[in-house]
Amino acid sequence: MKLLVQRVNEAKVDINGITKSKINDGFLVLLGIHKEDNESDIDYCIRKLINLRIFSDEDDKLNLSIKDLNYEILLVSQFTLYASTRKGNRPSFDKCAKGEFAKNLYDNFIKKLKLENVPFQTGEFGADMKVSLTNDGPVTIIIDSRSE
């Protein structure tokens, strides 16, 4: 499982011209699911995500987490995070989880994130979404359960 985490001042997801979700300060998280991911990958990624200290404290050190500040998360499924560009110029999606398997893991990720009492919103799995954001920093971090 791979998370691309961007620290944002605001982010939103539009579907068919209608805003589905919008946050202010927090994380825009793009979630990629590998074809071999399981529940332990979800647990690892959520633990890292909510405790990731990439917000500045009073000494301007990156020392505070989203949980410390009660900031929000906007979670968006992004199967292309596991695209491979090793051969040729067209990406291969062989490592990406497919269909119902990916949807089940995405739904389980959401269920487990709810248990952490961190405010969050989501995009819509499988939808054609327009995602917009204002980066803060910018600060962008990749959390990858396959390289723990």
From Swiss-Prot:
Under Pfam families, the record lists: Tyr_Deacylase
* Xref: SUPFAM superfamilies: DTD-like
Instruction: Tell me what reaction this enzyme catalyses.
Output: glycyl-tRNA(Ala) + H2O = tRNA(Ala) + glycine + H(+); a D-aminoacyl-tRNA + H2O = a tRNA + a D-alpha-amino acid + H(+)
Transmembrane ranges?
A: none
Q: Which UniProt keywords apply?
A: Cytoplasm, Hydrolase, RNA-binding, tRNA-binding
**Subcellular location(s) per record:** Cytoplasm
* EC number(s) reported in the record: 3.1.1.96
Biological processes per GO annotation = D-amino acid catabolic process
Keyword check for tRNA-binding: yes
Q: Report a single Gene Ontology molecular function.
A: tRNA binding
GO CC terms for this protein?
cytoplasm
Against InterPro entries, the record matches this protein to: Daa-tRNA_deacyls_DTD (IPR003732), DTD-like_sf (IPR023509)
Quaternary organization: Homodimer.
Q: HAMAP family, from UniProt?
A: Deacylase_Dtd
Domain writeup: A Gly-cisPro motif from one monomer fits into the active site of the other monomer to allow specific chiral rejection of L-amino acids.
NCBIfam families on file: D-aminoacyl-tRNA deacylase
The record describes the protein's role as: An aminoacyl-tRNA editing enzyme that deacylates mischarged D-aminoacyl-tRNAs. Also deacylates mischarged glycyl-tRNA(Ala), protecting cells against glycine mischarging by AlaRS. Acts via tRNA-based rather than protein-based catalysis; rejects L-amino acids rather than detecting D-amino acids in the active site. By recycling D-aminoacyl-tRNA to D-amino acids and free tRNA molecules, this enzyme counteracts the toxicity associated with the formation of D-aminoacyl-tRNA entities in vivo and helps enforce protein L-homochirality.
What does the sequence similarity comment in the record state about its family?
Answer: Belongs to the DTD family.
What is this protein's name? D-aminoacyl-tRNA deacylase
Q: Which gene encodes it?
A: dtd
